[in-house]
């Protein structure tokens, strides 16, 4: 990456300043060992949620609630975020972030469990936005479920879509990079999705459900 390009990326990441609530959520994420969405991708999530007026959203991978806060920022006041994580400690940290933000309890539904067990129980076509930010090996299954869950006009967002800049390099063939690269191709070629790959954060793959 050229110096100018790197500087532009840093500028974009810092363009929307994070407040103290988000910064504390990031600190808790670091303590728990989970990697939250980066600021540029988070800001993009807020914009996407606002653009589609997301009253019902699903987050796969709660972490410490950083991505959740960005989604809730863009959702209308009556919007409900369903967020799924297998780690109870993660959800406890996220609830702390929600309380600090003053988010009403009726605006979030936290579900503890394996996302691939939980997602099939959610209603077809009932969601405006699905955000994937969990174990990368399960990304193919998450994307398949997301397409089912989204209403026409709903938005899919997949974090870490460039995976430390490894995805664009065909010589990189480790398991994680290969899975994410294939997910990108699946979304790109899916007849029901209109996709774009944004260089925000560590790459944000987005698509609109036709």
Where are these regions (language model features)?
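A short alpha-helical cap/connector motif
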Residues: 1-129, 136-157, 161-210
